[in-house]
Amino acid sequence: MYLRRLRDLREDHDLTQTDIANLLGIKQTVYSRYERGYQNIPLEHLLKLADHYGVTLDYIFERKD
Protein backbone atom coordinates (compact mmCIF):
# COMPACT_ATOMS: atom_id res chain seq x y z
CA MET A 1 0.00 0.00 0.00
CA TYR A 2 1.31 3.43 -0.88
CA LEU A 3 0.88 4.72 2.68
CA ARG A 4 3.49 2.23 3.84
CA ARG A 5 5.80 3.41 1.05
CA LEU A 6 5.43 7.04 2.24
CA ARG A 7 6.32 6.05 5.78
CA ASP A 8 9.27 3.98 4.60
CA LEU A 9 10.59 6.86 2.49
CA ARG A 10 10.29 9.24 5.43
CA GLU A 11 12.05 6.85 7.80
CA ASP A 12 14.75 5.99 5.22
CA HIS A 13 15.56 9.71 5.05
CA ASP A 14 15.63 9.98 8.87
CA LEU A 15 12.77 12.47 8.88
CA THR A 16 9.98 12.89 11.39
CA GLN A 17 6.35 13.47 10.63
CA THR A 18 6.91 17.01 11.88
CA ASP A 19 9.71 17.51 9.34
CA ILE A 20 7.44 16.45 6.49
CA ALA A 21 4.50 18.44 7.82
CA ASN A 22 6.70 21.54 7.84
CA LEU A 23 7.78 20.82 4.25
CA LEU A 24 4.14 20.60 3.20
CA GLY A 25 3.02 23.58 5.30
CA ILE A 26 0.58 21.55 7.38
CA LYS A 27 0.30 20.40 11.00
CA GLN A 28 1.95 17.17 12.11
CA THR A 29 -1.44 15.78 13.11
CA VAL A 30 -2.69 16.21 9.54
CA TYR A 31 0.35 14.44 8.11
CA SER A 32 -0.11 11.64 10.64
CA ARG A 33 -3.67 11.22 9.39
CA TYR A 34 -2.33 10.99 5.83
CA GLU A 35 0.14 8.23 6.75
CA ARG A 36 -2.48 6.27 8.65
CA GLY A 37 -5.04 6.54 5.86
CA TYR A 38 -7.55 8.57 7.83
CA GLN A 39 -7.40 11.49 5.42
CA ASN A 40 -6.76 11.64 1.68
CA ILE A 41 -3.49 13.19 0.59
CA PRO A 42 -3.94 16.00 -1.94
CA LEU A 43 -2.17 15.47 -5.26
CA GLU A 44 -0.19 18.67 -4.66
CA HIS A 45 1.29 17.13 -1.51
CA LEU A 46 2.05 13.82 -3.22
CA LEU A 47 3.91 15.65 -5.99
CA LYS A 48 5.88 17.66 -3.45
CA LEU A 49 6.82 14.49 -1.55
CA ALA A 50 7.87 12.71 -4.75
CA ASP A 51 10.10 15.66 -5.67
CA HIS A 52 11.53 15.83 -2.16
CA TYR A 53 12.42 12.13 -2.10
CA GLY A 54 13.56 12.07 -5.73
CA VAL A 55 11.06 9.40 -6.76
CA THR A 56 8.09 9.18 -9.12
CA LEU A 57 4.43 8.88 -8.24
CA ASP A 58 4.57 5.42 -9.85
CA TYR A 59 7.14 4.45 -7.23
CA ILE A 60 5.05 5.87 -4.38
CA PHE A 61 1.96 4.05 -5.62
CA GLU A 62 4.02 0.87 -6.07
CA ARG A 63 3.36 0.70 -9.79
CA LYS A 64 7.11 0.50 -10.36
CA ASP A 65 10.04 -0.49 -8.12
Give the location of each predicted region.
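DNA major-groove recognition helix of helix-turn-helix/homeodomain DNA-binding modules
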Residues: 44-59
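Recognition helix of helix-turn-helix/homeodomain-like DNA-binding domains
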Residues: 25-40
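Helix-turn-helix/winged-helix DNA-binding modules
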Residues: 1, 12, 38-41, 52
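Hydrophobic side chains within well-formed alpha-helices
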Residues: 2, 6, 56-57
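DNA major-groove recognition helix of helix-turn-helix
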Residues: 35, 53, 61-64
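Conserved hydrophobic/aromatic packing and binding residues within compact polymer-binding modules
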Residues: 6, 20-21, 31-34, 60
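Short basic helix-loop element that most often maps to the first helix and adjoining turn
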Residues: 4-23, 48
